[in-house]
Each structure stands twice: as structure tokens, then as C-alpha cells.
């Protein structure tokens, strides 16, 4: 998982939803001594993008898994085991591989051509239905 700041000029911390996609803002920060500072060319590690709640497919970076309201930061997952929020889990099956398209979770089929867009927006394989609106997924 990745802990990162949000851009308050784009979103309030209250706009972020657990299990929802997050997107790149185009800004990168260096995390040092519990503080995010804009990254410079002298920074080589611990640089992380800030995130927003909406974006284009090529800005998709992960799924929000934790919200830190006090520090106006979130944690997002790019792989591993995590939960994804949907409007109705009955539309999905265990073992389905899913990706984000226009902010919605969609299912890959055996005939889906794996484009750069599909590869970059793949969320993972559904491992369980936690509730009517929450899926468990795994991505290696």
C-alpha cells in the first residue's frame, strides 16, 4: 500500500471513499520526517504522487483502502488483497478479473484484448463478496 497526500484544491478528504479508485494529480511529494514536501530533482526515494477521486484511465493509480482525515492523506493499494466498492456485487462472480473503465468496475472476458488501458486499469481477481456493495480482490 502507499500513503499519500490529497490535493485539497481538487478534493476534500470527505470526497474519498474506501474501495473506490484514485487517480494521479500530476504532483509528486517527498515524505520525510512525517511531512510531505513537493519533490525536487534531488529527491531519489520516498516520492509519492498525490491523488484525486476522478480522472482518465491513464491517471488511475489504485484503490483507496484507508482514509486519514486528520492528516488529509489516504492509503491506496496497487496490488495484494483489498476491498473494492461497487453498486451491486450480484453482477460479479468469484474468479472474475475486473478493471476500471470510466470510473466503473467491469469484468474481463476470455476474449478481451489486453491493451495498455486494460493492463493499467486492472484491479484484480474477485476472491469473495463481502456484502451487497463490497468485493474482495487479489492482484499479483
Language-model regions: role of each:
Residues 1-140:
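Extracellular receptor-binding modules and their adjoining Ser/Thr/Gly/Asp/Asn-rich linkers
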